[in-house]
Design a protein with these regions (language model features):
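Short N-terminal binding/cap micro-motifs at the start of the first secondary-structure element
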Residues: 10-21, 31, 45-46
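Glycine/charged-rich beta-loop-alpha catalytic/anionic-binding loops adjacent to active sites
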Residues: 108-118, 146-149
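Residue-level preference for short coil/turn positions at secondary-structure junctions
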Residues: 30, 81-82, 105, 147, ...
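Glycine-rich beta-strand-centered segment in the early N-terminal region that forms part
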Residues: 25-42, 51-93
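Mid-domain Rossmann-like dinucleotide-binding core that forms the NAD(H)/NADP(H) cofactor-binding site
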Residues: 122-193
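Eukaryotic N-terminal low-complexity, Ser/Thr- and Lys/Arg-rich leader segments
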Residues: 1-2
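A structural motif shared across PLP-dependent enzymes of the aminotransferase-like
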Residues: 93-106
């Protein structure tokens, strides 16, 4: 299978010269793994951070947020079957989604919402998970609750901020205030809630 891997450290964080197309054997699903044919990915800040800190002797396939179709399943898989369209934020310790196929543990995968195209769905997993956990798990906000409270979101038009803005304005009774620097970002934040 074809994959894009980093071959050397990219010390300035933006240097893509060390991203190279490589050929790898197609992995085999075992245990709780799904073999997913990758259809769309997004570039996450984690990709840049891993590129900056890369120091291994062998190439590393990056990429975490992805959408794809399950091609085969390991013997312990119970949640998915071949043909399922899925989305996920992969695991740091495994080969990434910048490849034709990826092994992903079924326990960190969900069915892709049918209302989203592949590119839109691939842009959501890690940002959406982070925003949800921040609002409901870390801050302890109750769904449909917290009336009278105010939530200030700095960077409300960014990746996590944009999801957090929508979750807070649609799923809680809080007053949501968001900051954004550019006029087009300010307009988007106002329209999002």
């Amino acid at each position: 299978m074809k994959a894009i891997a980093i071959t050397h450290a990219a010390t300035d964080g933006s240097n893509i010269a060390y991203l190279q197309e490589i050929d790898l054997p197609t992995p085999v699903a075992k245990g709780h793994d799904l073999l997913v044919e990758v259809k769309a990915i997004s570039v996450n800040p984690v990709d840049t951070k891993v590129r900056e800190g890369f120091s291994a002797d062998t190439p590393r396939v990056l990429g975490w947020d992805a959408v794809g179709v399950v091609k085969s399943v390991g013997e312990s898989v119970t949640l998915f079957t071949p043909g399922d369209e899925v989305w996920y934020a992969g695991a740091l310790g495994r080969a990434g989604s910048n490849s034709e196929f990826q092994l992903v543990d079924e326990r960190i995968v969900a069915l892709k919402p049918q209302s989203l195209d592949n590119a839109s769905a691939a842009a959501l997993p890690l940002t959406a998970i982070t925003a949800w956990e921040m609002l409901f798990d870390r801050l302890g906000v109750a769904e449909n609750g917290n009336e009278g409270d105010v939530l200030l979101i700095v960077g409300a038009a960014g990746g996590v901020g944009s999801i957090l803005t929508q979750l807070a304005s649609k799923l809680t009774k809080m007053t949501v205030i968001g900051t954004a620097s550019r006029p087009e970002s300010q307009k988007w934040v106002r329209e999002a809630g």
